[in-house]
Amino acid sequence: MRLASSSTSLPVPAAGHHPLPLTVGVLGSGHAGTALAAWFASRHVSTALWAPADHPGSISAIKANEGVVTTEGVINGSFTVSASDDLLAVIRSSHLLIIVTRADVHDSFVSELANFNGELAEKDILVVCGHGFSMKYERQLQCKRILETDNSPTTSKLSDKKKCKVNIKEMKASFGLSCFPIHRNDVGVIDLPEDIKIIFAQLFTARIIPIPPLQVLFFSNYITHAVAAVMNIGSVRDPVNSLTKRAEQWLLELDERTPRAETGFFFYGEGSNTYVCKVQEQIDQERRKVAKACGLHLNSLLQECNDEYGTDYATLREYCLAPSPHNVHYACPDNMEHRYFSEELCSLEDIAAIATITKIEMPLTRAFINIIHAGKGNFPPTDKTSSVIGNFRSGDLIRFGATIFVKDEKMK
């Protein structure tokens, strides 16, 4: 199936308030960005795809392939998007701009968008895996509203060297969505505006749960990713040119005697064994205690995992061993700049900053922050945070959805 849409000319929306047909601009062409662009095209949504010039994703390959993205998995076929390197044209052509990139490079995307603030006044910006995007950047972007998902709506992976083919392994059964400025229904409960509900019904089949922007920041990905990555840090190869010649020779000899697995490493199935899962559950307790101090009720890590995939795993270890979607491809950090270290460090530090504001102790979480900094060579690790949330006060948290502050209340 191929949708008739030029890879060079961008669709121009009619004037007015989010008229149909909907047009979207996906900013970021990595695994998730490419998958979502193809998914939207499969749902007959006119889709433009943009990425910065130095982006390592698929944009150049898709442009060379005349905008065609081939998918396998949940959907199978070839779909055409408008691949563009002209951000202004994408902004003007789109009702909804969708940022799909690592949280640790949000700064650069915001800088690009801020150059066109005059064009953003009537635009909504959706940030996939928001990591507290609205809390950090709402003053820098003069857009209509900032929407954030708590997790990626898709589990996907670019599956060919040309980067024009993507395996969409799963589309999530549910995910949380926030809106800033916060919208409440007639009885004062946090909700989504009606026009946003209409748009998301067109984009996704998932059950979408309205949540406050603050709750997005608490999503548990950092636990499943960073904790397992740190506890398997010995599997990460030494940095290039970091070894002496003698050490390099000995490493080669070790590899010859006991070769590292040629087939790869299943990060979830092999990297999150029973002992790692126990640590993850303890860090989850710290996460939920800090959230509760802000008036937020969070499900357990295991329940969040089951909710997003519509599954009924009895234990976290069972979830990590399930064949699909996390044990379909080998995926393990190969350096300290991998997102499981660098991106999730942002989440760890954000939540630690909130813990400081709410005066809740989270020693295990802070230990992982320090270990990641130490592994990156940032000596000595300190309690100082690079998170802008470190400058917040309780009133700032209330603005983004906190309601109460309770110190040291024991989790049940």
Swiss-Prot record:
Domain of life of the source: Bacteria
Gene Ontology process terms (BP): glycerol-3-phosphate catabolic process
Catalytic reactions on record: D-nopaline + NADP(+) + H2O = L-arginine + 2-oxoglutarate + NADPH + H(+)
Keyword set, alphabetical order: Crown gall tumor, NADP, Oxidoreductase, Plasmid
Entry annotated with the keyword NAD: no
UniProt EC number: 1.5.1.19
Subunit text: Homotetramer.
Protein name as it appears in the record: D-nopaline dehydrogenase
Taxonomic lineage from the root: Bacteria, Pseudomonadati, Pseudomonadota, Alphaproteobacteria, Hyphomicrobiales
